[in-house]
């Protein structure tokens, strides 16, 4: 693969990142934010696997960092709104999954920000940390919790919040935005992990595209039933 093919189209990638931010901030059905992330993640993985230290790559890293910080700020704002409702059992079970996904993504960003001479070590650190943070099980657990499959979570996340908020649309919209954000950053870190290990990214991408369609339908169904 030639160096200039790594980005496919840097401007298109940049627009994709901006689109993610816009969707998180404005879309009424927050799950729709998940859709643009797949193309963005694929481009980022190629950049990480075939590191090129040039001006365009550095600019791309800075722009992605800015988008991530803005997404995180939105997520934190939603967290404050959701703290009005206490659901101790679900929140306690869900907290570890959320923290693991956030940590996995932070370690992935360290690869993006690494100097060429440190890149290999950062990749190794990322893989080790990813495994220590329960590998790919966080995303599957989050998916099962949203879809209502009873494994780690004693009750489906969306059902519990619906009950305790009495179907408040704003609360549920905030929750869906927060969950969509976690799926976005979790997917990027997950694909980075699979990519570094040499896994079949195409089949993994297809699997999670289907999963995210299911999540989107579930969230839209819940939001339609709100007051």
UniProtKB/Swiss-Prot annotation:
Membrane topology type: Single-pass membrane protein
Phenotypic consequence of gene deletion: Morpholino knockdown of the protein has no visible phenotype. Morpholino knockdown in animals homozygous for the c14 allele suppresses the c14 phenotype.
A cellular-component GO term for this protein: membrane
Keywords, alphabetical: Membrane, Transmembrane, Transmembrane helix
UniProt keyword RNA-binding present: no
Compartments where located: Membrane
Segments traversing the membrane: 179-196
Gene Ontology biological process terms from the UniProt entry: fin development
Name the UniProt record assigns to this protein: Protein rapunzel
Classification of source organism: Eukaryota, Metazoa, Chordata, Craniata, Vertebrata
